[in-house]
Each structure stands twice: as structure tokens, then as C-alpha cells.
Amino acid sequence: MLPALYIFLIAVCILPTLPGLIGVIMAALGYMPALGLHHFSMQGFAQVFQWQGIGHSLGLTFFITLLSTYLACFFTFAILQSSWGTRWWRRIETALNPLLAIPHVAFAIGFAFLFAPTGMGMRALYALIDPTFNATSDTPLLIQDPYGLGLILVLALKETPFLLLMSISVLKQLNVKQTEQVAASLGYNRNQIWLKCVFPQWLSKLRFAIFAVIAYGVSVVDVAQIVGPTNPPTFAVLVWQWFNDPDLQLMPRAAAGAIVLFALGSLLLAVAFSIEWILTKGINQWLWSGRKAFRLPGKSVFVLLISLTALIIPLLTLWSVALRWRFPDLLPSRYSERFWQLEWSNILSTINVSVTIALISASIALVFAIVAHEYRIKYRWHIPNYIIAIPMLVPQLSLLFGLQVLTLYTNIHHYGVWVTWAHLFFVFPYVYLALDGVYRSYDQRLTQIGLSLGKSPLHVWLKIKLPQIASALLFAWVIGISVSLAQYLPTLMLGAGRISTLTTEAVALASGSDRRITAIYALCQALLPLCFFVFAYTINKKKAPTTEQVRSTHHELSYQ
């Protein structure tokens, strides 16, 4: 049974990667029989590099991705250095769930409402300085600025909680407490210990998570459309615009752009690996020469992160009920629930679609993740983690076009099924990795004891293992739901524009619709995954089974 499920998992979540890449390569080379293109050519690539401003767009994407990734790494390490093992860290761990729950799109819309030239930040500045003070400027500072500074800040702030989450298992493996004790006995203080002893190991073991952040940053479209530069846009947005060109004869250009985006992402991964090698092995004199170290403002960084995130919900709520809000008034002069009443029926149907797809894809992904981990434990041959994580490490546009072509060849027009499958394809790696730590830390001797009592593997799993990992399973399921709710490109491309979710509606409205309607959809998109995290937190408040409970379970099994 387990091998059959594992093969089915491979067929659904891993093998489609190959036709996805092959499909986009064939289209980039000009071979698309459905469009009457039967000959291979490099015209698509020529059209890409002939596009005016292509060099600027590529350079901008490279700069934004690299800077946002390492700014997030700096924020993460600063928070860890100042708080790991202290009371502060307990508060940070508690706050990680709501921070992770806020989707990128909702955060970006709230960020735009806060830092736009007529946003809450400028309104507060007017109120503090002088209501008659005139400091408005047509030059954007953080929202759609030409250098992408706002996009860098949004990506860095949103990826910091993810890197913190990934760092927990890394630091537990490193046994930081013992390292601190040994180094302290040699006369090093906490700052020196973390910089010279912990940082090199932490950076190396966090490589995979950093690669995932880079892959997301280089291919992000939804957030870049909201706060990113527009003339030229980032390269992923440019490729997305090419995919939406009504002239289908130009489709090879879009496919070639997706290949170039994949190459750019690969280059960034190589640069990240080189930076890691230089810091830890190449130019490593700083690790042992002298005792200079400095305290990073980790607590201040976390306060900034939690403050910005906490401002988003009330700000979106305020905009959703604002009937009249002139600039530079700090608060609306008139309030009304009119826009909620007008949009409520549409919102309910959109929420229904979003939640249905998220529940189905996350539940199947959870089952697949359990199957994959159980198979890895029982059998020597299994798919390596880096292959399972390919959807996380490859730009989405570089895969989705090929997957879209694959669905067209099947001649099945059930778009809801294809969208759910696309969500499952991208949700599964996150759920699998969320369970990786708990499966590796689980004591297999407990299972062996149960099997030695003559019980079936399924009976032992349900009675012994499941109670031990139930909290992690629930948390991984909720992560899968939040990842599904945040999917933008898979919904649009595999749904052919016929499936609307909160994310697709919020991005579409953020590009120029009424701020009040935009705020309503962004608020719903922010609160929905938060509700699931609150649900998981409430369930997990029940204590995990203690050692005595496990022993009593073994005793009970032995007499059944």
C-alpha cells in the first residue's frame, strides 16, 4: 500500500516538473504546433533581448532579489543573536504564527496604504508637524519607486519570519547552549560567540531556506505589481505581461523570457553559494583573528516587524469603512459600511472558492507528506529532498507555462481541478519540509516497541506515533492552507482567468481600484489564514502526551 501511494505521489507532485520544463523550453525555441509554429528558432530569445529596457529590468531584479534576501538574513540573525535562549525568544516564537499567517499580498497592500504619498504615514507626519505644511511629492519613496526600495523592504520583512522558523531546527541541531558554554569558558562574550562560532554553521545549514527565498524573490509577480517599480518593472512582471499579450504569435517570446528568468534565478543561487563559501571558507580570517564583535539590534528589528504587521489589520479595517477621507486628515470624517454591503455577496463566493481549494490541496499535501516521510524511513531508496523542493527553488513562471501546455493536451476543461492540482504542486514541498524536523526527531524505538508486541504497523502508528506528532501535523496542514491561499500565478494560469480567489481579486483591485474595496479584499485575505493559525494554536494548547501516557499506551497495547 505504501509503495503504491508513494508512486502516486511522485506522479502527481514530482514528475510534472519534467513536462513543465520541457514544455516551456520547446515553446521558447519556437515549436508550438497548436499555433502553427512547427520549426525551431531562436527568435523568441532575440525578441526578449531586443526589448527596450531589458538590461535595466534584469539588473533591477538581480539587485532587488539579492539585497532583500540578505537583508532578511541580517534581520533573522540579529533577532537570533539578541534573543535565542532568553525570555524574548519565547515571545518571538509565539508571534511567529501570526507573522507567517499574513499573506504577502495583504502585507504589501497594507504597506502601500501606510507609505504611499497620501498614506497613513504622511498623514501622521502632517498631524505631528503642521497641518498647513506642504511636503507632498510626485516622486515615490517606497511605493513603486524606480529603485525597488519598497519592494526590497517588503520582501525582507515578510521573509524574516520564514527564516526564523527554519532557523529553529537548525539551531537545535547545532546545540547552541553547549557552544556558548565552551566558548564562554575561553573568555568570549555572547556577541563574539554568535558571530564567530554560530554564524558560519547557521549560514551553511540555512542554505536551502535562503535558496527558497531567492527563488521567490526573483519570480514574485503579485507583490511586485503592488509596490515594485513600473518603468521598467521587475523581469518576472515583464514576462507575465508578455504571457498576457493578445498576440499568440508572440508566445515564444514569453516562454523565452521564462527561460531567461530561470537562468537569472540559477545565477542568483550560484552567487548565494559563492557568498556563503567566501564568508565561511574563503576569506575566513575574521573567524579566528581578534575578538572584535558587535551587538546587532535584533530586538529593535523584531519590534519594527511586529509593529508594521500589527498596523496592517487596523489600517485595512479603517479604509474599508471610510466613506470620506480627505488628505491630509489623520482619520476619516465620515464612516459607512456601504462598501461591505455592496461587495459582501461577491466576497462570500470568493472566500468559498479560496477555502475549498486550500482545504483540498492542503489535506492531500498532508497525506502525501506523511506517505513520503514514512516511505523514507522504511525504504532505502527515496526521492531526495532537493528534488521534492524543486517547485520552491524554480521560478513559478518557468514551470507554470509548461504545466499549462500539458493541461491543454489533456483536453479536460475542469479548471477548478487544474487549479487545485497546481496549488497541490506548490503546497506539497512546504508541508513536507514542515514535517521534516518532527519526523527526524521522533524516537523510532517507540514504534519498534509497539511492533515487537505483535501489533500491525497501522495500529502502532495510530496509537503511538500519531499522538506524538499530531501537533506538528496540524501546524503543517495550516501552513499548507496559508500557502494555497496566497497562490496567485497558479490560479490565473491554470484557471485561465475563470477561477477567482481572494489573492487574485486583491491584486487586481490594488492596481487602481477604489482603496476601500481593495482594503476589504486585502483584509479578508489577511484574516482568513490567521483564523486557521488561531484554530491550530487553540487545538495545540492541549498538552502533548507525556512519557507516562506513552508508557500506559504501551502497557495497554501489550494486553490487547
What is the predicted role of each segment?
Residues 2-33, 46-172, 205-222, 228, ...:
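Membrane-water interface segments at the C-terminal ends of transmembrane alpha-helices
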Residues 34, 38, 222-249, 328-333, ...:
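Glycine-rich helix-loop "coupling/hinge" segments at transmembrane-helix boundaries
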Residues 43, 47, 93, 127-130, ...:
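Short amphipathic alpha-helical coupling elements at transmembrane boundaries
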Residues 172-177, 181-202, 448-469:
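Short helix-to-coil transition segments within interhelical loops
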Residues 174-177, 273-282, 442-445, 535-549:
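Membrane-interface capping segments at transmembrane-helix boundaries
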Residues 184-186, 286-288, 451-453, 547-558:
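Short, highly charged, low-complexity non-transmembrane loops/tails of multi-pass membrane proteins
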Residues 247-259:
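Helix-loop-helix hairpin linking two adjacent transmembrane segments in secondary transporters
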Residues 275-301:
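Flexible interhelical linker loops that connect adjacent transmembrane helices
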